Amino acid sequence: MAVGVFDSGLGGLTVLDAVSRRLPEVPFVYYGDNLHAPYGVRDAEDVYELTTGAVSRLWDEGCDLVILACNTASAAALRRMQESWVPSDKRVLGVFVPLIEALTERQWGDNSPPREVAIKHVALFATPATVSSRAFQRELAFRAIGVDVEAQPCGGVVDAIEDGDMILAEALVRSHVEALKRRMPHPEAAILGCTHYPLMQDVFQDALGADVKVYSQAQLVAESLADYLTRHPDMLGLGAEPGFLTTGDPKSVSNKATQFLRRKIEFRAVEPL
């Protein structure tokens, strides 16, 4: 009954932590493609090939349902995967859906025409690849009209977090927020469009100001997954053991992951498919 969680590196651990707390009875298998991280500077074809390989590995681990806890993969690969690659007995879900549900206050199954929503000015902070894909704006446009989205590519932040350099990460976040606010001085809401960024949520909030509502994905994804599994209990795979897989150095990744989650995490090495 295992569920897979995939990320290019360690950022998806924020999602894993939230879904594990929300669904303690479900075993989760986490796959971090640390060898190829970060994805945010790769082109769409490269991201697609790496993501399909990772998802295939999680299927081999008995996870019929896989969460792409990586915004770059969700933006650059998910639609193509769902349209032409994922078999009918498997599911791959991305992390944009819960964000857009929260922002527009309407369910994903609601296919009525787009309508006006309360929030008009949204700041999007994401990797360069996610920003260039315009996937968030495209999905939002299906459900809402009249929303001005200003996107800021946050180069360097993921690398700093993966390296454990939180001082550099904070400086970069403040610089990126300042750059965005020169173009959109008064955003009403901010989307942290990378699963690494919740680790810096307090810094984003401080730099943006207390009056800006900051949407972070981990809790939203956890609630969305719980709802999905209630409606589709058959998508719990045959895998029964939780685990942590990495294409990187397992000792180094384990040490960093333990620092991330403040509990002992042990990864085992796998070869990328």
UniProtKB/Swiss-Prot annotation:
- Quote one Gene Ontology molecular function term: glutamate racemase activity
Q: Does the keyword ATP-binding apply?
A: no
Positions binding substrate in this chain are D7, S8, Y39, G40, N71, T72, T195, H196
- Enumerate the catalysed reactions: L-glutamate = D-glutamate
Q: Active site at which residues?
A: C70, C194
Q: What is its EC number?
A: 5.1.1.3
Keyword Isomerase attributed = yes
Ordered alphabetically, the record's keywords are: Cell shape, Cell wall biogenesis/degradation, Isomerase, Peptidoglycan synthesis
- Gene3D superfamilies from the xrefs? 3.40.50.1860
Metabolic or biological pathway, per its Swiss-Prot or TrEMBL entry: Cell wall biogenesis; peptidoglycan biosynthesis
One Pfam family from the UniProt entry? Asp_Glu_race
Q: What does this protein do?
A: Provides the (R)-glutamate required for cell wall biosynthesis.
Belongs to which family? Belongs to the aspartate/glutamate racemases family.
Which HAMAP family does this UniProt record tie to the protein?
Glu_racemase (MF_00258)
- What name does this protein carry? Glutamate racemase
